[in-house]
């Protein structure tokens, strides 16, 4: 993927989107308008696949984002959902502690099938003022060597960050950049820029702290 394939085919990667129901996974993936327009439903496993294209300084890259269509509310997902995934996003809701508490379960299911793939952890709904999951408590990604981003699906805040990080990992090229923004749905809410800067500083400060004792093996 250091350059577009000579035969003109766009490098395409299967990305699985996991996390508790209600954390905003579908809202997030639907922000990308061409992906929403071109999505396909796979009835056998109850999944919507959204092809999300991004344009980089090395050509186009596409993520086939698998969204569960709400099945996770009825327990875990079938292995067929995870098989052949090349990267993943685990999402939780920063206004709901239980969704963060369940992140290790999603991670365990993912790595049991996919083993060593690049994974981004995303804390969604940072536009909501009553944030419950604070920066200092978000440590799981550090223990498991994942990338973490605060996001707000409804405002498009940090929408591209997880995809850029994954694209660089998959391409093996930290110099890869997105050169054009995808068409996104208009923001439904606005984020408070000062608050976002404060959250970012808190995350950076938290990263410098030693990890808490392993009272609980997963958290």
Curated annotation (Swiss-Prot):
Residues of the Small GTPase Ran-type domain: 9-173
Modified residues (N-acetylserine): 2
SUPFAM superfamilies registered for this protein in UniProt: P-loop containing nucleoside triphosphate hydrolases
Location of region: Switch-I: 39-47
Coiled-coil ranges (or none): none
Stretches the record annotates as Switch-II: 70-86
Domain of life per record: Eukaryota
Keyword Repressor set for record: no
GO cellular component: cytoplasm; cytosol; nucleus
Keyword GTP-binding in annotation: yes
A molecular function GO annotation: GTPase activity
Gene3D superfamilies: P-loop containing nucleotide triphosphate hydrolases (3.40.50.300)
Keywords of this entry: Acetylation, GTP-binding, Nucleotide-binding, Nucleus, Phosphoprotein, Protein transport, Transport
Binding residues annotated for GTP, in chain numbering: 20-27, 70, 124-127, 152-154
One BP term from GO: exonucleolytic trimming to generate mature 3'-end of 5.8S rRNA from tricistronic rRNA transcript (SSU-rRNA, 5.8S rRNA, LSU-rRNA)
Compartments it resides in: Nucleus
Modified residues (Phosphoserine): 2
Subunit structure: Found in a nuclear export complex with RanGTP, exportin and pre-miRNA. Forms a complex with YRB1. Interacts with BUD5, CEX1, RRP12, SRM1, and DIS3/RRP44.
Role: GTP-binding protein involved in nucleocytoplasmic transport. Required for the import of protein into the nucleus and also for RNA export. Essential for cell viability. By analogy with Ras, Ran may be activated when GTP is exchanged for bound GDP by RCC1 and inactivated when GTP is hydrolyzed by Ran upon activation by RanGAP1.
Family: Belongs to the small GTPase superfamily. Ran family.
Protein name as catalogued: GTP-binding nuclear protein GSP1/CNR1
Organism this protein belongs to: Saccharomyces cerevisiae (strain ATCC 204508 / S288c)
